[in-house]
């Protein structure tokens, strides 16, 4: 395993640990999710470029589309919770009534 792959795997692991440990605030959870998506994108792109898989070259772009949708939904939920309750705690998500 090369040094670049190890760095990206460590970035993914640190983001996952941050998501699991600092889940009280919604903004920190969203930042950890974005870090995980970024490291997954870089690892997938490097793997596809190193193995010369031309048919799988669209997969990282599709991952970026899903990451953008996740970020938009997360930020809209963050704005809704913070304007309604005045704070961005994840515990406030249980109080939402649809």
UniProtKB/Swiss-Prot annotation:
Q: Which InterPro entries match?
A: NADH_UbQ_OxRdtase_chain4L/K (IPR001133), NUOK/Mnh_C1-like (IPR039428)
Transit peptide keyword on record? no
Q: Where are the transmembrane segments?
A: 1-21, 29-49, 61-81
Is-annotated flag, keyword Transmembrane helix? yes
Assigned keywords, A-Z: Electron transport, Membrane, Mitochondrion, Mitochondrion inner membrane, NAD, Respiratory chain, Translocase, Transmembrane, Transmembrane helix, Transport, Ubiquinone
Give membrane topology per the record: Multi-pass membrane protein
- Provide one Gene Ontology biological process annotation: ATP synthesis coupled electron transport
Its chief place of residence is mitochondrion
* Location in the cell: Mitochondrion inner membrane
Which protein family is it in? Answer: Belongs to the complex I subunit 4L family.
| Record's protein name | NADH-ubiquinone oxidoreductase chain 4L
Q: Which organism is it from?
A: Vampyriscus nymphaeus
């Amino acid at each position: 395993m090369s040094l670049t792959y190890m760095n990206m795997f460590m970035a993914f692991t640190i983001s996952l640990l941050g998501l699991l440990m600092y889940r009280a605030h919604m903004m920190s959870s969203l930042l950890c999710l974005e870090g995980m998506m970024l490291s997954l994108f870089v690892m997938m792109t490097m793997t596809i470029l190193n193995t010369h898989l031309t048919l799988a070259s669209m997969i990282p772009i599709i991952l970026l589309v899903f990451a953008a949708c996740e970020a938009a939904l997360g930020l809209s939920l963050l704005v809704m919770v913070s304007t309604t309750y005045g704070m961005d705690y994840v515990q406030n998500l249980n109080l939402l009534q649809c």
